[in-house]
Amino acid sequence: MAVDADRVAGLAHRVVTEHDPKTVPVTEFLGACYDAGLSWVHFPEGLGGLGLSRGLQAVADAILQGAGGPVPLGLNPMGYGMAAPTVREHAQSEDVKKSLLRPLATTEDIWCQLFSEPGAGSDLAGLATSAVPDGGEWVINGQKVWTSLAHKARWGLLLARTNPDASKFKGLTTF
């Protein structure tokens, strides 16, 4: 683990030296972090990570933020916290993963969550928005409210009911 921590620290020092967060645009700095594998060190190489232990993220963050770098989770909370792991695990191909993860990591693409609904609020068991398959697509019917960062978001994680016959706590799918 010490060797891995030294590797992460070395990469982080290189990023802040070559892309001083106090003088370069945020997107450039975060792009350099992604390219170095420091966005999520536990993600696979080539997807913003190094394939290392999640605990080593603290090593990278201390150096990057100590040099004045931004806290990405604060800039794109749904992107970093929920969308990135979902994309990593469920996107259809490596190309799709790369096309979504890098702009998410740089905050060029902000993500939001589409969960809360009128009449149900944040009670997901009361969710009424439906998703019905239609050929190779899904038809979504319903509405969402209180969508933080929707005004900045390019992408959203939508929660919809896909099985109306299931109990109210089941039959939900994220799109």
What is the predicted role of each segment?
Residues 61, 84-87, 101, 157:
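Conserved protein kinase catalytic domain
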Residues 67-71, 86-117, 135-136:
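FAD-binding glycine-rich core of flavoenzymes that anchor FAD
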Residues 1-78, 94-99, 103:
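Amphipathic, small/basic residue-rich leader segments at the start of a protein or domain
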Residues 46, 116-120, 145-146:
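Short, solvent-exposed loop/turn elements at beta->coil junctions and helix N-caps
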Residues 141-175:
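A short core secondary-structure module
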Residues 129-132:
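A structural signal for short hydrophobic beta-strand segments in well-ordered beta-sheet cores
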Residues 119-127:
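Active-site-adjacent elements of ketosynthase-type condensing enzymes
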Residues 70-85, 105-114, 144-156:
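FAD-binding core of FAD-dependent oxidoreductases
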